[in-house]
């Protein structure tokens, strides 16, 4: 018994030390981001883009492929930094009370609520330069269970605003971040979120300080971005190109993948446990606003007995009045790549454990006859870790792409 108690005490001590290290890292990073932001803040305009008549997606992508990439899958410090900066926030984001509390935006950003096309209110942080010079804008979207306050999102937003000179909007997609406190419409794996992004693009395009609007998203935000690009003909507010980082082709296949327990040795296993934990936290939170007795068994289910496929079947698809099959069809970007009429760059990593690289085979096939869509596969990058493995490469690709497609 003494040995057991001693072991438990050691585990608790180790957990407290790990939590202290993570919290210290987050606070230090927050301070460093603010310091860098104010050091870079200039107010100058982005570099002028190419002549509109000379712009060509194929030649641009070939140029971006030549940007030196130093990222390696064995970059343990970069991977550890990304995990520390973002994993703790994902757990906080799972509940309304704690979502978006870390990494607040600086005072140069205005907090607004915009309305998606189905009436869903969405929280956003908007950075508009005050020098009176109209300039292009970028809408930046987080991934599943994330928020606009995730480290990689806010760091990208602050860099785009202060260093590249863009206007910026960081969005909390429906049911995530502060948006989950505004309405309880469930997430749709990118289907309705694509319209959230286009509503954000509409909001920015109506600002007199904005000349064109690009969209970029990560993971589920990437799927949302790909779907938004396909809908840009119907919602003509995406005028400055789009980049999707670590997206997917088939939403049903992806939700099944993250809901299926992998072997202990699989790199995805710790992420799977994290998803399970976040789903459990989210279900506990949902008890505060769902009182349907038929859903109680789902909400009360244990850590390992309910998953995201159940969420789609019992919560999301019924809420939007569609079958599960129609839900997945609407949320699968590969079904709509032939419809994309705006420049869309899809960046993916060969070693992505969450959205497997094989997903891109389906995207490439679906977009084979569409010159507006290009897929750029990188040898490493894990899942949305490009910024931590090679920030110089990541910044260059992002800045050069959106500068190229910006209009004035």
Predicted regions and their residues:
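Alpha/beta-hydrolase-fold enzymes
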Residues: 19, 24-25, 29-49, 53, ...
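Acidic catalytic loop of the alpha/beta-hydrolase fold
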Residues: 350-355, 384
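N-terminal cap/lid segment of alpha/beta-hydrolase-fold proteins
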Residues: 88-132, 387-388
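Short beta-strand/loop motif that positions the catalytic acidic residue
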Residues: 340, 346-348, 352
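Short, surface-exposed "cap/lid" segments of acyl-processing enzymes
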Residues: 127-173, 180
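Catalytic histidine-centered segment of alpha/beta-hydrolase-like enzymes
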Residues: 381-392
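Alpha/beta-hydrolase active-site loop
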Residues: 186-208
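N-terminal targeting or regulatory segments adjacent to alpha/beta-hydrolase or S9 domains
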Residues: 1-108, 401
